[in-house]
């Protein structure tokens, strides 16, 4: 099992947190375990509450059913169903930017 460095950036609050996330754990779950309060609602990849924007790196979010191909291509990620597949940097709290 690989572990990756996930950097979570909240531009509105000016915060940046780095956490280690195993490749078999969702980013949202790992962030919560570390005490970070990220937005979420369904926890199933079926809404946009937890949306973030991928700055660098790659994730597997094949469990999600909400984002369309254009949004995924633009770098949006649902942290509740995203596994890191490399070191990643994600801007959090991006739900409003989807629309």
Curated annotation (Swiss-Prot):
Molecular function in Gene Ontology: 2 iron, 2 sulfur cluster binding; electron transfer activity; metal ion binding
SUPFAM superfamilies noted in UniProt: 2Fe-2S ferredoxin-like (SSF54292)
Annotated cofactor note: Binds 1 [2Fe-2S] cluster.
Keyword Transport: yes
Function comment: Ferredoxins are iron-sulfur proteins that transfer electrons in a wide variety of metabolic reactions.
PANTHER family named in the record: FERREDOXIN, FERREDOXIN-2, CHLOROPLASTIC
Identification of the protein by name: Ferredoxin
Species name: Desmonostoc muscorum
UniProt lineage: Bacteria, Bacillati, Cyanobacteriota, Cyanophyceae, Nostocales
């Amino acid at each position: 099992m690989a572990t990756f460095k996930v950097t979570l950036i909240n531009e509105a609050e000016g915060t940046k947190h780095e956490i280690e996330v195993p490749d078999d754990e969702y980013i949202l779950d790992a962030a919560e375990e570390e005490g970070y309060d990220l937005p979420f609602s369904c926890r199933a990849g079926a809404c946009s509450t937890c949306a973030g924007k991928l700055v660098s790196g790659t994730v597997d979010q094949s469990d999600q059913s909400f984002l369309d191909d254009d949004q995924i291509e633009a770098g949006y990620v649902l942290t509740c169903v995203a596994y890191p597949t490399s070191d990643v940097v994600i801007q959090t709290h991006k739900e409003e930017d989807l629309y």
